[in-house]
Amino acid sequence: MREEEIKKALEEKFYELYGNTEGIRYFFAPGRVNLIGEHTDYNGGHVFPCALSMGSYAAVKKREDKNFRFYSLNVEGAGVISAGEDDFTPLEDKQWAAYLKGVIWAMEKKGLEIPCGLDLVLYGNIPNGSGLSSSASLEVLMGSICKELFGLSVSFPELALIGQYSENNYNGMNCGIMDQFASAMGKKDHAIFLDTATLQFSYAPIVLKDHCIIISNTNKKHKLIGSAYNDRRRESEEALEILQKFRPIKSLGELSDEDFFALENEISDPIIRKRAKHAVLENNRTIAAKKALEEGDLHRFGELMNLSHNSLRDDYEVSCEELDTLVDAARALPYVYGSRMTGGGFGGCTVTLLEKEKKEEFKRRVAESYERKIGYPCSFYEAEVSDGPREL
């Protein structure tokens, strides 16, 4: 659906559910794809994401009381989810609207006043479970709605931090800051080079000329909560505690590759050693990839993407058969520069850099290989790099 069609669908459903549509407002917040720098954001490293043109949309209107009503066109079977002041229960709330409620809860925790409730209808065009940050998109959407409707004095980087806080503490997911920051701070045709230790960031133009970035979706649903994601964070923290005995560091992201290799044998557990190796080398690959993109060296950028995936597969162990099948099928093609999993892993999507004129052949050949091996089809999206949240 085009944006105008989405607004119309939201308005019609809003009228059907809540009656009066006078004074409703419309908002959007993007999803994101990470070009390189995976599982580095909670390790104090660098990430290199960009916001996407797909994301979450809402029609919303203030209420006169303190009640909230949420409805999603994507989860129509759930009906209207209502919440009064006493219906915000961290770590117990498992409905889709928990990502919105968590932000309201987090804002009040941070001393931002939410003076009244809202009626809201949502539509998202990020495939659920794709690893393109539908949850962060919802959090940034809710944050920007509250910022605009209630005139809250809060910056977009602060909205990203509120989204991360709510996902950690309300939804029970120990995510880093990357997803929310990429959604909140997106800039059209630019990637965000973010130092997650300091939140210092810069924009890097994505100049691909005769090349393009294709996102390939395994269509394997992943749910990070309760999966190995939180285990990886714990393992990384264990590695950091060991290495802090030998270096005055606050995060693994402070180490060079040489630092790590000089110290790696101090980590006796081979699993913990592998986790640390990924965190350190992936951070330094990300710094090198940003430089390669700025210099127009797409071959080097592609090589770094490949090394990133190999590390996520072998050292961090967050890939899966479906992701590896997509990556292997892509890399077998001579016009592909690099391919890697993107997002938390265990399913979701890959991101591939290739020659633009070959993109239809790429989709056909990868789709054939994937379905032959996995037994069901994958999907493709051309990455369209977008601005951050906005009122429509």
Where are these regions (language model features)?
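C-terminal nucleotide
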Residues: 1-32, 57, 61-93, 190-338, ...
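Gly/Ser-rich oxyanion-binding loop with an adjacent helix/lid
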Residues: 2-27, 33-37, 43-46, 82-85, ...
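N-terminal cofactor/phosphate-binding cores enriched in small/glycine residues
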Residues: 37-39, 51-52
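Short Gly/aromatic-enriched secondary-structure transition segments
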Residues: 44-51, 232-233
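Short, charge-rich binding segments
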Residues: 49-51, 59-62, 111-112
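Short beta-strand->loop micro-motif that forms the acidic, two-metal-ion catalytic signature
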Residues: 347-353
